[in-house]
């Protein structure tokens, strides 16, 4: 079916989002044009505001509206404890848990030489500077368990060791509420390796 050029432009714009193919993009465009004109205007305004007003925190690389993000600005956060994560979504997951009171360093990806993502693209030079300032006493590695995530964790481990900073890795294994019969062997093996004493 042939669309008006502006409709095609809207559909193509939606396909830049992860997981949105041409059919989903078409449905979204039709929904906005058919019955969501005011919602579409609000979406456009929010997109413009975010594209113009959101930047990366100078300290941790998370999203921010000024030079520092709310976590780095908060004097109640423990600046000696820094959790290394791949994405701002990972920060949100930790924050929603309500258990972590340290700061973060957001890599915005993981090492992947085949994709042209090296240490500089992940801001690891910035992390190295922070480590050498002497204010960080422990890094918590919370990268993924993929090949890229493990390579990134090992690279960061080397930086931390060179700076004399302690390193820990988040536990991995069986999810809360998970049934063992549905857990894959590699995950179960990791859970066994990461076991700890059990007390009441």
Curated annotation (Swiss-Prot):
Residue ranges covered by zinc fingers (C4-type): 57-72
- Species name: Alcanivorax borkumensis (strain ATCC 700651 / DSM 11573 / NCIMB 13689 / SK2)
Q: Which UniProt keywords apply?
A: DNA damage, DNA recombination, DNA repair, Metal-binding, Zinc, Zinc-finger
- What would be one Pfam family of this protein? Toprim_4
Give a short account of what the protein does.
Answer: May play a role in DNA repair. It seems to be involved in an RecBC-independent recombinational process of DNA repair. It may act with RecF and RecO.
Q: Which CDD domains match?
A: TOPRIM_recR
Any single GO molecular-function term of the entry would be: DNA binding
Domain annotation Toprim: ranges: 80-175
Family in the record: Belongs to the RecR family.
Q: What is this protein called?
A: Recombination protein RecR
Q: Which SMART domains match?
A: TOPRIM (SM00493)
For biological process, the GO terms are:
DNA recombination; DNA repair
């Amino acid at each position: 079916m042939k669309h008006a050029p502006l409709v095609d432009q809207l559909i193509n714009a939606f396909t830049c989002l992860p997981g949105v193919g041409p059919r989903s993009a078409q449905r979204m465009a039709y929904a906005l044009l058919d019955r969501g004109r005011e919602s579409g205007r609000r979406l456009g305004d929010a997109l413009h505001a975010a594209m113009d007003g959101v930047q990366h925190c100078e300290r941790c690389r998370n999203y921010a509206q000024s030079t520092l993000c709310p976590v780095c600005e908060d004097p109640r956060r423990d600046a000696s404890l820094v959790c290394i994560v791949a994405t701002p979504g990972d920060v949100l997951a930790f924050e929603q848990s309500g258990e972590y009171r340290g700061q973060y360093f957001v890599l915005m990806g993981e090492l992947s030489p085949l994709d042209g993502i090296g240490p500089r693209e992940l801001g690891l030079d910035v992390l190295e500077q922070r480590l050498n300032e002497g204010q960080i006493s422990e890094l918590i590695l919370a990268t993924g368990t993929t090949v890229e995530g493990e390579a990134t964790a090992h690279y960061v481990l080397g930086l931390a060791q060179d700076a004399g900073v302690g390193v820990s890795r988040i536990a991995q294994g069986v999810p809360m509420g998970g049934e063992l019969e549905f857990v894959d062997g590699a995950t179960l093996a990791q859970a066994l390796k990461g076991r700890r004493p059990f007390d009441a």
